[in-house]
């Protein structure tokens, strides 16, 4: 029984790690990483800083998904974030949820 439990935990960890990599790939293919980095500020804020700022807020996922699709200005400084209408609504939600895990 112990071996089965350990195996299940290990498989879950690998699956979750794979999801994180898939979401990072989505961030790259969507153009997010042209201006953002996970850990450090580039043109835009670090994704982990965004995740930390909005963590625990009721509408954080929907709010961030909206910013991903529609862009924003005067939120993180003078450089506006351009809209990214090419990102589908469902992918914007996946990206927002991914960012919220990076606190």
Feature names for model-found ranges:
Residues 34, 43-54, 67-96:
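Axial heme c-ligation environment in periplasmic c-type cytochrome domains
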Residues 99-103:
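Short hydrophobic/aromatic patches at helix-to-coil boundaries
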Residues 21-38:
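Sequence/structural segment immediately N-terminal to covalent heme-attachment motifs in c-type
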Residues 2-21:
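Classic N-terminal secretory signal peptides
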Residues 13-15, 25, 40, 74:
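Generic structural signal for beta-strand residues in well-ordered domains
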């Amino acid at each position: 029984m112990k071996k089965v439990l350990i195996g299940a935990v290990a498989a879950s960890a690998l699956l979750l790690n794979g999801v994180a990599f898939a979401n990072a790939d989505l961030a790259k293919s969507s153009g997010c990483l042209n201006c953002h980095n996970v850990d450090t500020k580039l043109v835009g804020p670090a994704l982990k800083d965004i995740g930390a700022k909005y963590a625990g807020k009721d509408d954080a996922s929907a709010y961030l998904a909206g910013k991903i699709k529609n862009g924003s200005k005067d939120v993180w400084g003078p450089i506006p974030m351009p809209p990214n209408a090419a990102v589908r609504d469902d992918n914007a939600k996946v990206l927002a949820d991914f960012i919220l895990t990076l606190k």
